[in-house]
């Protein structure tokens, strides 16, 4: 069976609580069945109380954290255009990074390209 799951607050909790993504109190379930595939989308939720600088910083911190956790857990972090082609055909566990709030842009149009770059090749935001 192929399974698609959207996590709206798991990534935020893991980052802000300094916990592991597979913490049993979260709803992340890894697929151990080689005949099925699981795609889990991790949205970075940004509270309305954050100012633009804090939201931008939390976005990049979350992107780095998700990449690290996917490496640790053996989850394939997919880039733009990959998820529909590969998630249910190649990988037992895959993930897609999303953002839930435009506040992460912090009023900087150049962040659109920076965010896309992270999604295209899973690079860190550091250059």
Task: Annotate each language-model stretch with its function.
Residues 1-126:
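N-terminal hydrophobic targeting/anchoring segments and the immediately downstream early-domain regions
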């Amino acid at each position: 069976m192929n399974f698609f799951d959207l996590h709206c607050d798991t990534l935020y909790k893991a980052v802000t609580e300094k916990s592991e993504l597979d913490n049993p109190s979260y709803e992340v379930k890894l697929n151990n069945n080689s005949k099925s595939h699981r795609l889990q989308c991790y949205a970075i939720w940004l509270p309305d109380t954050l100012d633009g600088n804090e939201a931008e910083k939390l976005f990049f911190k979350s992107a780095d954290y998700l990449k690290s956790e996917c490496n640790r857990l053996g989850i394939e972090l997919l880039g733009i255009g990959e998820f529909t082609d590969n998630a249910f055909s190649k990988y037992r566990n895959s993930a897609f990074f999303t953002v839930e709030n435009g506040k992460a842009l912090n009023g900087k149009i150049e962040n659109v390209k920076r965010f896309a770059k992270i999604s295209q090749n899973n690079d860190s935001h550091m250059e």
